[in-house]
Amino acid sequence: MSSTVISLAHFCDKHGPRIISVTQSAEKGTLGEELLVPDYPTESYCESCLLQFPEESTRSMRCFIEDVPFITTQYSSIRYQLLNSIIKRAFSEETMIYDNMPFIFFDDLRGLNLVIGFKLYDENARGNERRYCFILTVDSRSHDDSMKMLSEHWNFIIGGFDKMIAYIKNIHKSEFLGKNKTVENNLETLNNNAFIGSYLRANKSKFGRNLVSLTDDKFLFVRIHKWNSFLLHTVMNENKLP
């Protein structure tokens, strides 16, 4: 099992910091069965923090790149406590911002973590915004080796996260405009400001919406799985961390 993991997390209005998806890899030549999760009840997840694949009964997604299995799940049964500790730290950081600016933290408990936050406008959310972040975790106690890996692949990793975030924001903007056809196409601040102008109706009841609904893309988490797998494979191919 690789020491490098990519997570997508969300600050849920109802549950606080929650992991939406985790992408990990297993040993080359195996099926990665230990990373799959069993069928589990989803009642403890609200609509905002639920991982939603096109087939509702699907709980895990797996692909192979050069015979290495990459698995995406709602949570990691192996790193459950670790990743929950990481997202709580990430969302509680005073430096946490949501304009795609990365920040890094490292300690012996959580390893090295690169966090990039972003937000999407949603009038049905508290504060009219939903907050997310992608996190690259290097689960290693070697600060020097982890930083070396990160510095060597900095532009690639940051660029990879930026591309996925830009895709999510763009299709979210298209979905928003599709439902608000009378709004002028001048929404550069759509996902950067919590307040979006006087044409939006206030005092609506708040309810949960996940990324599939916000983007109107039922294959979004499939795309995230494939993109994260590509990022992990590229980084892993050149680095072997203890």
From Swiss-Prot:
InterPro entries: FLCN/SMCR8_DENN, Folliculin, Folliculin/SMCR8_longin
Any one Pfam family match given in the protein's UniProt record, by short name: Folliculin
Domain of life per record: Eukaryota
Ranges that cross the membrane: none
GO CC term, one of those recorded: cytoplasm
GO molecular-function terms, A-Z: GTPase activator activity
Chain ranges of the uDENN FLCN/SMCR8-type domain: 48-212
Observed effect of gene inactivation: Sensitive to high hydrostatic pressure (mechanical stress).
Record-level GO BP terms: cellular response to amino acid stimulus; positive regulation of TORC1 signaling
Additional information: Present with 656 molecules/cell in log phase SD medium.
Function of the protein: Required for the nitrogen-regulated transport of amino acid permeases GAP1 and PUT4 from the Golgi to the cell surface.
Name listed for the protein in its UniProt record: Protein LST7
Species of origin: Saccharomyces cerevisiae (strain ATCC 204508 / S288c) (Baker's yeast)
Gene: LST7
